Amino acid sequence: MKKNFSYWRIFHHIFALPYCSLEKAYKASKRIQKIKKDYFLYKNILFSSKRSWQSILFYIDTELNNSVFKIYLSLLEYKLSLWLIQLFLIFSLFFKKNSKFDLILPNINEKKKKRKINRKLAWIRATLNDLESWRRYYLFSSFLSLDKKEKNNFSFLQMKSSRLTAIAYESIGLVPRSITRTFSRFKAELTNQSSSLVLKEFRLAKYQALASLQYIGCLFFIPLGVSFFFQKCFLEPWIQNWWNIYQSQIFLTSFQEEKALKKLQEIEELFWLDKVMTYSSNKIQLQDLTKEIHQQTIELVQIYNNDSIKIVLHLLTDLIWFITLSCLFILGKERLVILNSWAQELFYSLSDTMKAFFILLLTDLCIGFHSPHGWEIVISSCLEHFGFVHNKHVISCFVSTFPVILDTVFKYLIFRHLNRISPSIVATYHTMNE
């Protein structure tokens, strides 16, 4: 009895799969219709909040893409479950009729359920067909028309070869942004749209923060993971085999050779000193001393041979890391725009004192009084990482010129951009700097 009941539950679950999958796709299509109805509320957020136009656009586009993905995934599950049911029906011809099984089979052929399924499928098909035209008309054409009307206040999306050009933040116009936002909030209060706008703005802020943090995590972990995977699985065994078999040289640079010779001279002098301190000059055997020096020479050769392999490995690993990071920047232009907007909003939401504090902290770290010593350590580490000679003249030349260039760039950014956005930040910065 229990066995038959378990079989009946399995059959019931399998035959219910098409209805559940179709219901998921139907709810996702309803979600698309809701996003399209709430489109004008999203558009009002632009005038009543600090959100950038790109963040709103990418939020709407992401929600639509998620719903479309759920629809296609549910329809695939629907087709697979129908295929499984057909297999059950075919195999049922080879077995004896089961009363429980017969109770389930007629449910598939009910006319009402068939009509309901056909209506839902037609609704989903019409929603997907309408979505592309809706996107072209509202997400592109209407945005471009709004850009022409409000170009004195904001910078919107621009159309170029049917593609979107990313703009990081709202531009400065003749009318201050605080006035337009206050007017838009007052208008929303009059039309009883404040609660819905707050909810939409919260969802948009949540999406913007999550998308930015995910992109930062991808920029940090994916290049490291890819380079580490290639290093351990492919590059390290291949380079060791290639260097030890096909390369006769041991030292990759002259700096390594000079360093090894100095080390060998120090070892030989230490051996002579140890023998002289232990025995008299007449009892020192040159053969034993030569064997010990020869053994230390072999160990030094092995050490510097491994160092040469590590230098080549570091070069290829860093190249893979750079290529992976460049691909992430190229493929993630939309996320980069959102990250730029989110970072600017975080910066502009701070008080003038905190803004000036972070600017001073960054400038003092890079071009402050103690920064040349830090730059010397960084450059020396980079030279040792790639196996180059530790040249004091090159390091001093770089340290004496590069911070000056950075100082010029910082001053240009402060007086060019911050002076336009918020003159009080520049005044606070000069006060704290003095």
UniProtKB/Swiss-Prot annotation:
Name the record gives this protein: Potassium/proton antiporter CemA
Membrane disposition: Multi-pass membrane protein
Annotated function: Contributes to K(+)/H(+) antiport activity by supporting proton efflux to control proton extrusion and homeostasis in chloroplasts in a light-dependent manner to modulate photosynthesis. Prevents excessive induction of non-photochemical quenching (NPQ) under continuous-light conditions. Indirectly promotes efficient inorganic carbon uptake into chloroplasts.
GO biological process: potassium ion transport
Keywords: Antiport, Chloroplast, Hydrogen ion transport, Ion transport, Membrane, Plastid, Plastid inner membrane, Potassium, Potassium transport, Transmembrane, Transmembrane helix, Transport
GO molecular function, one term: proton transmembrane transporter activity
Transmembrane annotation, as ranges: 75-95, 210-230, 311-331, 359-379, 395-415
Pfam families: CemA
Highest taxon of the lineage: Eukaryota
Record field: catalytic activity: K(+)(in) + H(+)(out) = K(+)(out) + H(+)(in)
Protein family (similarity comment): Belongs to the CemA family.
Signal sequence annotation: none
Organism: Marchantia polymorpha
GO cellular component: chloroplast inner membrane
Annotated localization: Plastid, Chloroplast inner membrane
